[in-house]
Amino acid sequence: MIMIITKKTLLPVTLALFSSGVMAHGYVSSVEGGVAESRAALCKFPANGTGEKNTNCGSVQWEPQSVEGPDGFPETGPPDGKIASAGLSQFSPLDEQTVDRWVKRPMQAGIQNFEWTFTANHITRNWRYYITKQDWNPNKSLTRSAFDLTPFCQISGDMAKPPMRVHHSCNVPERKDYQVILAVWEVGDTAASFYNVIDVMFDGDLPTVPDWAVGGQIYPSMDLKSGDSVYTRVFDASGENSALSTELTIETEQQGQANNWSYSLAQQINNVYDNIRAGKADGEGNFAPIYGANPIYLKEGSGLERVEIGYNIITPEPDHDLDISGLENEYQIGDEPVSLELNLTAQGDQFVELTVYNHNKEALANKQVTLNDGDSQAVSMRLSKSEPGHHMLVTRIKDSSEGSLIDQITNDFHLTEGGDPPEGDYDYIFPEGLKSYTAGSKVLATDGRIYECKPFPYSGYCIQWSPSATQFEPGVGSDWSTAWIKLN
């Protein structure tokens, strides 16, 4: 577990309407007993039990659920060298591959429980799990040749929607040391799959050290600034023993680099205590600090149980908050192109970039605004084309001085045909009241026609819709006729 004490206050971005990750679907997690989190998930969420996180991940830290690429692996799918990113350029940092680049989660051969968490639970064909060969090279880009291309586990999705979280019991093959597991979720209603690589460390990587046992780890999870400090929290049977804490205060920018302070803290521990050691063990009682993750060993018989890492972040960082108002849930298409009339109000200096995409991910409008603390500014975004269907407003908020991404939010809205609704007998204007649709329900669709939900067993498809899964949308979805009868 990692404890962070900080004077920085993080304020959520305030929005005038519901935000959702539209181009977002699912990732390998460990919320309810999953054995290990994916590389992408650890870019956003701390590891269960240790608090470790991946760093310098790029934009996937905001949407680990979106690592989606072409299906058909291994025959097709993402190209070699881009498997971890699913071939998406915005997630290319995931393709970096060295023996010490990523957090590794403990793994054992045998039956293990893998967990997926979904933000949009599509109809599923199957899930497949692959693992690297024992002799793979962890310092080369991930290619098909690194993997055993026969999945060690395959779970059928039965072409049905799974619950929002699923677990798979899989028999993991024997391996040693650092390996990568590739989890593939093949969606059943699109030509896409989701690719999650999982970095794992099998038992046996750390040498057996007589009279010593592993009690923790110094993981270089982030760079620190001058004045910040990192320290150990040592626990025995009675709880935390603060007298045994070792603290390292950062004095220079170079010392604050993650691998450097990890080395220095391990070195300081070894210089102070006889019953605590940190670094790479040689099996003969010698411990050498390294520039990277340093295991912490406790002397057997010392009464010590574990060591955790804490941070004292005293360097203040500016608070940022952005209020966006004026975005409607629905816009009617008229003679003129649709225009979004928004108002932005900033807390903290920031650079804001707004982009409108249609459901095909075409950019239709872009606006860039620099706001000072307290500024309020009207923004007009005229769309390059106005066609019925689902659209997204993507807002990227960056620090105006450094250009670093603070937050990214996606908001949904729809364009509909203009004019008064046609005369006719219908119960809902699609997709209003979606969860209430049953056999015989009549809806006015976005094409201006009226559709009736088919009888059982097809009626269940009528409620299977989301902005990112539109195959059963009446009149326009690829499989709309499976669920609906056109009435006019």
Swiss-Prot record:
Q: Name one GO molecular function term.
A: chitin binding
Q: Where's the Chitin-binding type-3 domain?
A: 439-480
Q: Which Gene3D superfamilies match?
A: 2.60.40.2550, 3.30.70.2150, chitin-binding protein cbp21
Establish whether keyword Protein biosynthesis is in the entry: no
InterPro entries recorded: Cellulose/chitin-bd_N, GbpA_2, GbpA_D3, GlcNAc-bd_A, GlcNAc_Chitin_IntDeg, Ig_E-set
GO cellular component assignments: extracellular region
Entry's localization field: Secreted
Coiled-coil regions in this chain? none
Chief location of this protein within or outside the cell: secreted
Chitin-binding type-4 domain location is: 25-202
Task: Please state the span of the N-terminal signal peptide per the UniProt entry.
Answer: 1-24
Instruction: Give the UniProt keywords, A-Z.
Output: Chitin-binding, Secreted, Signal
Q: Which PANTHER family match?
A: CHITIN-BINDING TYPE-4 DOMAIN-CONTAINING PROTEIN, GLCNAC-BINDING PROTEIN A
Q: Which family does it belong to?
A: Belongs to the GbpA family.
Role noted for this protein: Probably interacts with GlcNAc residues. May promote attachment to both epithelial cell surfaces and chitin.
Q: What is this protein called?
A: GlcNAc-binding protein A
Organism placement in taxonomy: Bacteria, Pseudomonadati, Pseudomonadota, Gammaproteobacteria, Vibrionales
Coding gene?
gbpA
